[in-house]
């Protein structure tokens, strides 16, 4: 049951917002399992938006998801740089959710539904999580991204990118 939505003459951000709220709420209520979006933008933009809505409503999982905190004074590593590196190395892992958190204070709670977690625990120290459980502590920050990838591989969630 596809939902068809035709949006014309709107800015791209407005189309993203209106289609997400209009179609997303219907999908969450069980009134469909697909999206057919038509707009004045390219098919690529329409397709990305449609799959984004399906992913957000858990109707169809088609990409890796990331949870990341906004960073604060407790963050003791370059969160933006590490997040970018993790995304570039793992963005092909369809259906995997990875939390990247700056500190131990709120990080584990904010990423509670992640499959894997990368959490700063001190100066130059990272802890890795599988689900809500800590599986490795006090990993040096310079090797922690590779350790995260090794953890994903060890749990059978790694596939090689094309």
Report the location of each language-model feature.
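Glycine- and Gly-Pro-enriched alpha-helical subdomains that act as flexible
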Residues: 44-67, 71-89
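Hydrophobic alpha-helical bundle architecture
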Residues: 82-112
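Beta-strand/loop-dominated core regions that host nucleotide or nucleotide-derived cofactor-binding catalytic loops
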Residues: 123-129, 134-157
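Conserved structured catalytic cores and adjacent interaction surfaces
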Residues: 43, 72-76, 104-110, 114
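Single conserved hydrophobic/aromatic residue that forms the stacking wall/gate
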Residues: 2-11, 15
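Glycine-rich phosphate-binding active-site loops on the catalytic face of alpha/beta enzymes
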Residues: 29-43, 120-134
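Catalytic cores of alpha/beta
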Residues: 16-25, 106-114
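Conserved, mostly hydrophobic/aromatic
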Residues: 26, 69, 103, 111, ...
């Amino acid at each position: 049951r596809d939902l068809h939505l035709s949006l014309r003459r709107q800015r791209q951000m407005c189309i993203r917002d209106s289609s997400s709220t209009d179609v997303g709420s219907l999908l969450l209520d069980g009134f469909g399992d697909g999206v057919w979006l038509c707009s004045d933008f390219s098919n690529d933009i329409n397709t990305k938006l449609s799959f984004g809505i399906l992913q957000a409503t858990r109707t169809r999982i088609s990409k890796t998801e990331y949870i990341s905190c906004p960073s604060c004074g407790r963050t003791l590593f370059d969160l933006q740089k590490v997040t970018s590196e993790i995304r570039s190395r793992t963005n092909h892992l369809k259906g995997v959710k990875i939390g990247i958190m700056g500190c131990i204070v709120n990080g584990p709670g904010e990423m509670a539904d992640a499959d894997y977690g990368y959490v700063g625990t001190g100066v130059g120290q990272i802890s890795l999580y599988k689900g809500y459980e800590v599986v490795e502590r006090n990993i040096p920050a310079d090797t922690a991204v590779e350790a995260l990838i090794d953890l994903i591989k060890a749990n059978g969630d790694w596939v090689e990118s094309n």
